[in-house]
């Protein structure tokens, strides 16, 4: 077979043969096989050219995708599949990129976790979930997590939460709110409780009284329309307890209020 045309088409070249066959190849393919118009190639050589062209095209696509930011093996593999590249060729491209250090799931996971240590607010459980979604193996994630201490991150988040809710919630509700937020962000209950216990979060009696009477004003208006006497007192006690107030504070406030 003889090459009758080599024509540049954007990022690829169109190669036509005298038997009517056509295929798109990369510039790397032309250089590797020293292709030119009128060159004669065999069926075997054509197969090698086509395979390498797919590999070269896939690698170029992957490198373009990686040029914007680091990606995991799973992300690159899924990106290449959009271009209908043969699965075997995709695996070859991935293996080549890993060998050349363009893809390294361990480094990717380390970078994400380390960035979180410096300025993030996520605990190990959420990070594990996010990294697993990127295709990183559980064993790789666990190995890297073992190198980090999340107590400082938990403390940083707890301090921010304290600033947000202090003076707005009674002591028990404040504790519940901060611990719940920490566990939602991926910290264990144990670590969340330690972070809370290290806060300077004393809610003084005057603040508690102010908060409880403010809440009573709102709830009394709501329940006094339907209840009175003992039933009203019970309803108010229940709603205040759900809001996080201690029963002793509730009883004291109701004695003054009713």
UniProtKB/Swiss-Prot annotation:
<dbReference type="GO" id="GO:0005737">
    <property type="term" value="C:cytoplasm"/>
</dbReference>
<keyword id="KW-0963">Cytoplasm</keyword>
<dbReference type="GO" id="GO:0006282">
    <property type="term" value="P:regulation of DNA repair"/>
</dbReference>
<dbReference type="Pfam" id="PF02631">
    <property type="entry name" value="RecX_HTH2"/>
</dbReference>
<dbReference type="Pfam" id="PF21981">
    <property type="entry name" value="RecX_HTH3"/>
</dbReference>
<comment type="function">
    <text>Modulates RecA activity.</text>
</comment>
<protein>
    <recommendedName>
        <fullName>Regulatory protein RecX</fullName>
    </recommendedName>
</protein>
<dbReference type="InterPro" id="IPR053924">
    <property type="entry name" value="RecX_HTH_2nd"/>
</dbReference>
<dbReference type="InterPro" id="IPR036388">
    <property type="entry name" value="WH-like_DNA-bd_sf"/>
</dbReference>
<dbReference type="InterPro" id="IPR053926">
    <property type="entry name" value="RecX_HTH_1st"/>
</dbReference>
<dbReference type="InterPro" id="IPR053925">
    <property type="entry name" value="RecX_HTH_3rd"/>
</dbReference>
<dbReference type="Pfam" id="PF21982">
    <property type="entry name" value="RecX_HTH1"/>
</dbReference>
<dbReference type="InterPro" id="IPR003783">
    <property type="entry name" value="Regulatory_RecX"/>
</dbReference>
<comment type="similarity">
    <text>Belongs to the RecX family.</text>
</comment>
């Amino acid at each position: 077979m003889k090459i009758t045309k080599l024509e540049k088409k954007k990022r690829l070249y169109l190669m036509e043969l005298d038997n009517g066959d056509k295929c798109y190849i990369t510039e790397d393919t032309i250089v590797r096989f020293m292709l030119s118009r009128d060159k004669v190639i065999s069926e075997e050589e054509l197969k090698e050219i086509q395979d390498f062209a797919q590999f070269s095209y896939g690698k170029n696509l992957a490198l373009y995708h990686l040029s914007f930011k680091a990606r995991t093996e799973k992300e690159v593999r899924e990106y290449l599949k959009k271009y209908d590249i043969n699965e075997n060729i995709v695996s070859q491209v991935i293996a080549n990129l890993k060998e050349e250090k363009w893809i390294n799931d361990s480094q990717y996971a380390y970078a994400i976790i380390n960035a979180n240590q410096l300025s993030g607010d996520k605990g190990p459980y959420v990070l594990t979930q996010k990294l697993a979604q990127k295709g990183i193996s559980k064993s790789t994630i666990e190995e890297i997590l073992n190198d980090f201490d999340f107590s400082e991150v938990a403390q940083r988040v707890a301090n921010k939460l304290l600033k947000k809710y202090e003076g707005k919630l009674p002591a028990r509700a404040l504790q519940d709110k901060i611990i719940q937020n920490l566990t939602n962000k991926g910290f264990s209950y144990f670590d969340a409780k330690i972070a809370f216990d290290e806060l300077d979060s004393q809610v003084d009696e005057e603040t508690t009284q102010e908060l409880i009477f403010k809440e009573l004003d709102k709830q009394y208006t709501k329940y006094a329309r339907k209840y009175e006497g003992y039933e009203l007192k019970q309803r108010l006690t229940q709603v205040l307890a759900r809001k996080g107030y201690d029963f002793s504070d509730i009883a004291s406030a109701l004695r003054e209020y009713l």
